[in-house]
Amino acid sequence: MEIPKLLPARGTLQGGGGGGIPAGGGRVHRGPDSPAGQVPTRRLLLLRGPQDGGPGRRREEASTASRGPGPSLLAPRTDQPSGGGGGGGDDFFLVLLDPVGGDVETAGSGQAAGPVLREEAEEGPGLQGGESGANPAGPTALGPRCLSAVPTPAPISAPGPAAAFAGTVTIHNQDLLLRFENGVLTLATPPPHAWEPGAAPAQQPGCLIAPQAGFPHAAHPGDCPELPPDLLLAEPAEPAPAPAPEEEAEGPAAALGPRGPLGSGPGVVLYLCPEAQCGQTFAKKHQLKVHLLTHSSSQGQRPFKCPLGGCGWTFTTSYKLKRHLQSHDKLRPFGCPAEGCGKSFTTVYNLKAHMKGHEQENSFKCEVCEESFPTQAKLSAHQRSHFEPERPYQCAFSGCKKTFITVSALFSHNRAHFREQELFSCSFPGCSKQYDKACRLKIHLRSHTGERPFLCDFDGCGWNFTSMSKLLRHKRKHDDDRRFMCPVEGCGKSFTRAEHLKGHSITHLGTKPFVCPVAGCCARFSARSSLYIHSKKHLQDVDTWKSRCPISSCNKLFTSKHSMKTHMVKRHKVGQDLLAQLEAANSLTPSSELTSQRQNDLSDAEIVSLFSDVPDSTSAALLDTALVNSGILTIDVASVSSTLAGHLPANNNNSVGQAVDPPSLMATSDPPQSLDTSLFFGTAATGFQQSSLNMDEVSSVSVGPLGSLDSLAMKNSSPEPQALTPSSKLTVDTDALTPSSTLCENSVSELLTPTKAEWNVHPDSDFFGQEGETQFGFPNAAGNHGSQKETDLITVTGSSFLV
């Protein structure tokens, strides 16, 4: 049985003297409805008190006791035996029962169960000396506070004399046995084993019995063998005076009430957490049990575990587990009662949260037209229709009904439709790319035209770009701006571009998503850049005329002719008109296309025309000269094994009696305006000094007839150069020449036929010993040929020089 309005009053009695409260020692007030002449019905029960010498006590001792703090309420005494009398203070627990008409109030009979409590702060009459008995002359202190039970104003029907109630009262986490029988209140402390955790307190009926109404004598010691006689007092009924003003409680008694110090309001039994340094209180016992789980050894123990396999959820209460099981069963028993909603939820809490949305629905009302909206944002959007000006400009696209205030706003809106239709398309032949903005199309067109207006101004850089954004991105390299850091711990790498960081992050995943597309190659890579480097190995196996740049000093490979032309425009600054002439001239091919296929031998007349025929039109000469100057055309002839026609009479020590190797014209790296070439004979013992071949003397160059050479200067022992004509005689020093062929007038000449050769035959390459090798090379402006290498390869022993 629980009495919710029964509150403890706590005090401490100091000193070694008497301990009890004398009969009539404390004033109490009668309820307003109690008749004055009724027999005494109040009972003042002191459940615990000093057991050191009886009820008598001096006034000065009581006054001293009221000022000192004491141990906690109902705490088991360890420093003093229950029957001992010595010094020291002890706690007492005071209960004042005031039933109406001598009967016990009954719970559930129309009013709240239990008496209404009121705080008492008056001093009652005390005792003089050490004798017991009432002495109305001198007041004495009754402890820090008393509680008087005041009956409710309305009369309450009471049960008959034979009615009895029994139960347990828990006050500050301490259990007390309680029993009402025939108007008698019985309270007792459970046996010592009942305080153990989990043990239910045993009821002891009839432990402490107060005298019946109308008998103001104290209870006999034999009535309750467990408590001494000074713990039970009877008080006769007295007229209740007006309550005195409340005094502020001293010591720990002020912290007993649920609302701070004990007040006049109804009290609630609180359950205090027994753990040290916690101090939390709870209104219900099960709340305390849930709280105690947090103090268990496993910190947050959850004894209720979901029984379904693979779930693993645990909970502190069985209700939460039950609510969790509904989620497994897909049960949603709590449906929304709103009309047209139809939503259901697993818990009532979720339903209540959902219902708040219905309560706020259409709670925002427009002050102009009284229309309601569910949110403030929608209301604000609606209110603009009342206060904004007219919007005469409407979008003309089908399905779009938006209107605008100004024409510029309409045009800005139309760009959104243009982006959807992708109206900005590239007009370059063969390109079908489309863009949502004209500026992006303009940047794309620069990739076709080769225009790169944004130049890097860093010293020695020279890079240029099609857009400012790419230039700014490039400048991060110069500033070492590596703003994109790898987030993986221990990596520490940083990058200038976000896409580089994205590609690097794949390496931390341990996967290789980039696969080589070449059939039969199963290579995989974790980075796209590694795949690109690997793919170059496969490109070296394809025909080089389709992929290699025709510029002799450039070894870049390309997958299409279009990309190769784009490269020539961007890197080598070749104009579009020159590219068109290059495509139109079928005889002009890159140097890499010159293969080992030999042509038919020519007659003497054709050899003569090689040096004498000059074309009527100068267009071919201009084209060939432009190609040579730009470095596009490089003619590498591997060998020429021919004899020159005509009789060459001996001059001085020169004779034609011995065969000589044909001359070899090697390419150098000087600018094409003054082509420095070296004429070598096929033996290591004989060579000719380096001389200059002027571009003005070259009329036409082609693979077929090789054009016409106006003159080839010849230098003998005399410093005066003389022209080389078809009838001129070529005199060489035959003493140091190794015979390989005979120079006679009836010999048959061969065309300067091409053979397989490297891209650039450098003067230091090993061509000595290759019989019949003659190479013509026109260098480009990008190369550079050192004089040291030339002197190492040339040995001057002859007396004749070919200039």
Curated annotation (Swiss-Prot):
The gene is ZXDB. Belongs to the ZXD family. GO terms for biological process: regulation of transcription by RNA polymerase II. Gene3D superfamilies: Classic Zinc Finger. Disulfide bonds: none annotated. Self-associates. Interacts with ZXDC and CIITA. Pfam families: zf-C2H2. May be expressed in brain, heart, kidney, liver, lung, muscle and placenta. Cooperates with CIITA to promote transcription of MHC class I and MHC class II genes. Residues 13-26 have a biased composition (Gly residues). This is Zinc finger X-linked protein ZXDB. GO terms for cellular component: nucleus. It comes from the Eukaryota.
